Amino acid sequence: MAAITISSSLHASASPRVVRPHVSRNTPVITLYSRFTPSFSFPSLSFTLRDTAPSRRRSFFIASAVKSLTETELLPITEADSIPSASGVYAVYDKSDELQFVGISRNIAASVSAHLKSVPELCGSVKVGIVEEPDKAVLTQAWKLWIEEHIKVTGKVPPGNKSGNNTFVKQTPRKKSDIRLTPGRHVELTVPLEELIDRLVKESKVVAFIKGSRSAPQCGFSQRVVGILESQGVDYETVDVLDDEYNHGLRETLKNYSNWPTFPQIFVKGELVGGCDILTSMYENGELANILN
């Protein structure tokens, strides 16, 4: 989840491309995203949408219709009915009425409720600005106006919007990389491929030899295997048997090693469990959970 770089003037450049934010030492970095769905994804504030000038002015006027942060009523979060399930900008205050975070959401009530469950000590009240036409440009402008106002008054960014503060921000977990058994097909191995396979399955709790990667399986059986292992919350390794660059010769070598003719193949604690059908059966009857624990 990317951060948003904002200079002291909070000026956005007119480029439609998503660019990697450049952060100088003196440039505050603040975060727009809510931890909880439904929120919008804005990779950076160093861009605007490809609008005409009238369109940009229209977005500004719509966003400006939202009351200023100071003028907006502070609502107790405990009174759930008072928080609308609408799109817009919202500001979370702690029990001492100190601003903690400014975010945007398609459902403000749901986002605030989720914040309350996650960090109740930081959620005492909330200010809400409903945006009638919640496209990205309008919501960004409304959020920007509230942030600008707070910085102008206090000289600082709300804690939850600072770079590195993930209290209110959902972090997308990085998927584990797939194992590459060799440095490349044109590199001569000093250890036989079968020995590399043997080391891997014996030194890892769970290894799945699949078609494709864990993030993009190339067959339904491999996708099913990844889904089952993910559901178990187990740490597991994946090896792409279709990767002829870094796993060249793996398919035939693995068939000989395991004496199993098809893929995917799943090993648990050094022993072959079988393929997708067997793993699915073990998952459904509870046996898989037992051998993984």
Swiss-Prot record:
Protein's UniProt keywords contain Cell division: no
Transit peptide residue numbers: 1-62
Effect of residue 115 to F: Strongly reduced nuclease activity
Biological processes, Gene Ontology terms: monoatomic cation transport
Binding site for glutathione: 211, 251, 263, 276-277
SUPFAM superfamilies named among the record's database cross-references: Thioredoxin-like (SSF52833)
Gene Ontology CC terms, in alphabetical order: chloroplast; chloroplast stroma
InterPro entries according to UniProt: GIY-YIG_AtGrxS16 (IPR049620), Glutaredoxin (IPR002109), GRX_PICOT-like (IPR033658), Monothiol_GRX-rel (IPR004480), Thioredoxin-like_sf (IPR036249)
Keyword Transmembrane helix assigned: no
Positions bound to [2Fe-2S] cluster: 219
EC numbers on record: 3.1.-.-
An example molecular function term from Gene Ontology annotations: hydrolase activity
Gene3D superfamilies: Glutaredoxin
Places the protein is found: Plastid, Chloroplast
Disulfide bonds, paired cysteine numbers: 123-219
Annotated effect of mutating residue 143 to A/E: Slightly reduced nuclease activity
Enzyme class: hydrolase
Effect noted on mutating residue 111 to R: Slightly reduced nuclease activity
Subunit note: [2Fe-2S]-bridged holo-homodimer. Interacts in vitro with SUFE1, BOLA1, BOLA2 and BOLA4. Interacts in vivo only with SUFE1, BOLA1 and BOLA4. Interacts with SBP1.
UniProt xrefs under NCBIfam families: Grx4 family monothiol glutaredoxin
Function of the molecule: May only reduce GSH-thiol disulfides, but not protein disulfides. Participates probably to the maturation of iron-sulfur proteins and to the regulation of the redox state of the BOLA proteins. The GRXS16-BOLA1 heterodimer binds a labile, oxygen sensitive iron-sulfur cluster. Able to cleave linearized DNA in vitro.
Family that this chain belongs to: Belongs to the glutaredoxin family. CGFS subfamily.
Protein name: Bifunctional monothiol glutaredoxin-S16, chloroplastic
Lineage: Eukaryota, Viridiplantae, Streptophyta, Embryophyta, Tracheophyta
